[in-house]
Amino acid sequence: MIWVAVVITMLLFILVAKPTGIYLEKTFQGSKKLDKVFGPFEKLIFKITGVKEYNQTWKQYALSLVLLNGFMIVVVYFIFRLQGVLPLNPAHIEGMEPTLAFNTAISFMADTNLQHYSGENGLSYLSQLIGITFLMFAAPATTLALVMAFIRGLAGKELGNFFVDFTRALTRVFLPITFMAALVFVALGVPQTLDGAVTAQTIDGAKQSILRGPVASFVSIKELGNNGGGFFGANSTHPFENPGQMSNILQMMLMMLLPTALPFTYGRMVGNKKQGRILFVSLFMVFLLGFITITTSELNGNPALNGMGIEHVQGSTEGKEVRFGTVFSSLYATVTTAAETGAVNTMHDTLTPIGGLVPLVNMMLNTVYGGVGAGFVNIIMYAIIAVFISGLMVGRTPEFLGKKIEGKEMKLIAVTILFHPLLILGFSALALSTSLGTDAISHSGFHGLTQVVYEYTSSAANNGSGFEGLADNTPFWNITTGLVMFLGRYFSLITMLAVAASLKEKTVVPETVGTFRTDNSLFGGIFIGTIVIVGALTFFPMLVLGPIAEFLTLK
């Protein structure tokens, strides 16, 4: 029965992807029906804020994005610092320490949601609503806007206006869907209230304080926006965030909804629907491989315990919730790192070595399917690399969407693809070379190395999940992961927007018999191979020293 439920869940991922992709295309390309519904409200917003609806250059688009995001980071930073004297603080929580406020503000603006604090004890209701939830909408709206400009550039069209795209992402995508999802979560038992904690009496007569809050609205945008941060410290293992299997499946659907839809949106916007389908199918195969790997490893249990003759019919149950079970915990771990969300319904630090390797690889690749917008930019980056390598092998000038890929584009892509591993491995080396970093490690040996690398991988990929055995709420970890999140977020977005702007100016080369097609299974295979060879092998030495070595030790 459990496998039937898994198959149904997978089918739901597939069935909703195309309709959502079509809706996104109509949202950002213009639709008379949608304009009638949302247009008056959006024009009012533009009038109040003084936004002019004109086409921007790629530099203007990128500058608008960075300035708006930077302003939001500063505002929310001061909310966190001053929450102790601000209203809506029934628990009388003190203001955040400076480096923690710095880390948290960047974390949520970068759509990472790395949390070096415990949600229910670290933030007031005002900080949760005005600070955290506000950024949970703004962050994915930023990248959804940018990816639309990116696709327009690839299609040879004007990039559009960042503020217009940003507003439409909020009014036409995130607000309507999260409103409906929040109502469903409330029906499934997720609380939604501004009242303070409830004091309950336990069976043995002791008193227990049960924290609650506006959780349903928080969870809906947490998952849809690929944010991942928890209202509670336990994240989606907490019964108030994720009461049962229905809420668990709904959360996974929300996480996958936009990332899986974007290949179809892309196909329609560039006039090559078949290429969009090829990208979707290719990435789904990689996703399935990851799920099969982690599930097999977790069901086989811990090799060290198996050798002692301990029963493991349910697999490795350490760190997992009984109400979800091993299989759905494995699926959730695959989804949350494939979609770069970072929400967890099981403790990733307790996964088996190979089980923990899958989330780590998903984040290192950052393409299967990646987070809202940012992940799809990486997908196209790998697609262009695949075309470039194929062109070199047959002695032809590489072409993508009928436009020649030349030195300028490849230099930008080369810098972008190297920057991700440089952030992860460079900062990991820094942490391992100083006691400021190593003092946080709770396990010596191979697992300790994995804890460190996982933290920086999660930060660079804007995922936010963690091996929570790492004691990371220190100035060193707050500052370094904050820098990694900021750089990992904005560097690749800006460089790839420059690539799209460069391709926009090029003329379309007529297709010939010798043109390498990017809408067939051959390209799909080369695309997957490029991801594995260029992406995975970059990190292979680290994976050998970390989870693979730990696995061999346990065996």
UniProtKB/Swiss-Prot annotation:
- Please give the positions of the paired cysteines in each disulfide bond: none
Q: Any idea where this protein resides? A: Cell membrane
Q: Which UniProt keywords apply?
A: Cell membrane, Ion transport, Membrane, Potassium, Potassium transport, Transmembrane, Transmembrane helix, Transport
How is the protein disposed in the membrane? Answer: Multi-pass membrane protein
- GO cellular component annotations of the record: plasma membrane
Question: Does the record's keyword annotation contain Transmembrane helix?
Answer: yes
Top-rank lineage group of the source organism: Bacteria
Entry's transmembrane regions = 2-22, 60-80, 130-150, 173-193, 246-266, 278-298, 374-394, 412-432, 483-503, 525-545
InterPro entries named in the record? KdpA
**Where does this protein chiefly localize?**
membrane
Q: What function is annotated for this protein?
A: Part of the high-affinity ATP-driven potassium transport (or Kdp) system, which catalyzes the hydrolysis of ATP coupled with the electrogenic transport of potassium into the cytoplasm. This subunit binds the extracellular potassium ions and delivers the ions to the membrane domain of KdpB through an intramembrane tunnel.
| PANTHER family in alphabetical order | POTASSIUM-TRANSPORTING ATPASE A CHAIN (PTHR30607), POTASSIUM-TRANSPORTING ATPASE POTASSIUM-BINDING SUBUNIT (PTHR30607:SF2)
What do we know about how this protein assembles, alone or with others? The system is composed of three essential subunits: KdpA, KdpB and KdpC.
Question: Which protein, by its recorded name, is this?
Answer: Potassium-transporting ATPase potassium-binding subunit
- The record lists the organism as Bacillus cereus (strain AH187)
